[in-house]
């Protein structure tokens, strides 16, 4: 049967005008049908006089030229819609450029068209791996702007839930980090602990993921006896899980070699690049908002700030494990010190009334209607900035009021956006295979970075 001639690759007839792959217009072999013959000729030359075959002889080897590679935005290892364009010499990265904004939704502008309470669910969708931390950061900023006092029990509840959110975020980071390095089973192990935390969130807030449990002036629901029991059971067993992960990874040769000395950032570079959170402390800077600018009840509990001096991916791994241990300490102290009392402000202009008041009293129904319609009204011209120590770093909200129930301006200090600014520096001189490990060690969430 006669063979039909296949058409040339689109653009072959354009010659030098075809620039889809710069410097790759050379024909390594004449046609696809000659591929096997070319490989055999190359093997024969390697066993003979060492000279390359005639079809391969060229002054420039295409494989030794500089190459431009797109990593993302549709790539599972970029932890979201992150695009990184790298210039390589062989497999070594000479330069990289980040291209972000693929998940931009205009959250700051949306906030200006919502009441302060209506914007709460939008914060869940920023860092969607630790939504409770976003809720608390927003509430604290509004409460500072409007000078709202939060009951003590509500502050303890917020602390406990925020630390559970931190553990949940770090568990996902560790599982994904192991999978990025080739250990797929580790992803499943860390999700067992996340599932326990989701069950606690469901019991407390009625939702597993985007909880929206914190409220301006307090929290939506109090802890039930079952919720407290579930939290105590979790903090009793979780340290053993951490010890199991340490036994699995701390001396694992593959894990250590994939992370040690990779993506290194010195203390001076970390400060210049604006790193925050675990990435900053992993480079030797002991800064934690919970200690230096305490909020809620963090100044009443005892905990240490983990710090590592190496500044590489392995240091960031050790630091996040230590952070989870400290979160367990904080939760245990919160449970012991939490007293009975109200969970929301009793001022009808500052917080929603309870459901019992809404259902069984005319005043409660009116207050609920007015707060939903108007919301919190800070003084005109007031402005404030409040930050918390989220799982990714310093998460802050800057608010400006025009005297209405909606903010005049909202500015979000997102740690994922801040940390990504250091990535171009971290990738320089690294192997392209280490790109996914470096991205994972920064732990970015693109919903928060792009806003």
From Swiss-Prot:
Q: Which UniProt keywords apply?
A: Cell inner membrane, Cell membrane, Membrane, NAD, Quinone, Translocase, Transport
Residue ranges that the Swiss-Prot or TrEMBL entry lists as coiled coil: none
EC id: 7.1.1.-
Q: How does it sit in the membrane?
A: Peripheral membrane protein
> What SUPFAM superfamilies does its record include?
HydB/Nqo4-like (SSF56762)
GO MF = NAD binding; NADH:ubiquinone reductase (non-electrogenic) activity; quinone binding
Q: Where in the cell is it found?
A: Cell inner membrane
Catalyzed reaction equations: a quinone + NADH + 5 H(+)(in) = a quinol + NAD(+) + 4 H(+)(out)
GO CC field: plasma membrane
Matching InterPro entries: NADH_Q_OxRdtase_suD (IPR001135), NADH_UbQ_OxRdtase_49kDa_CS (IPR014029), NDH1_su_D/H (IPR022885), NiFe-Hase_large (IPR029014)
Highest taxon of source? Bacteria
Q: Which NCBIfam families match?
A: NuoD, PRK06075.1
Q: Which family does it belong to?
A: Belongs to the complex I 49 kDa subunit family.
Q: How does it assemble?
A: NDH-1 is composed of 14 different subunits. Subunits NuoB, C, D, E, F, and G constitute the peripheral sector of the complex.
- Sorted alphabetically, which PANTHER family does this protein's record hold? NADH DEHYDROGENASE [UBIQUINONE] IRON-SULFUR PROTEIN 2, MITOCHONDRIAL (PTHR11993:SF10), NADH-UBIQUINONE OXIDOREDUCTASE 49 KDA SUBUNIT (PTHR11993)
**What does the protein in this record do?**
NDH-1 shuttles electrons from NADH, via FMN and iron-sulfur (Fe-S) centers, to quinones in the respiratory chain. The immediate electron acceptor for the enzyme in this species is believed to be a menaquinone. Couples the redox reaction to proton translocation (for every two electrons transferred, four hydrogen ions are translocated across the cytoplasmic membrane), and thus conserves the redox energy in a proton gradient.
Know the name of this protein?
NADH-quinone oxidoreductase subunit D
Q: What is the organism field in this record?
A: Salinibacter ruber (strain DSM 13855 / M31)
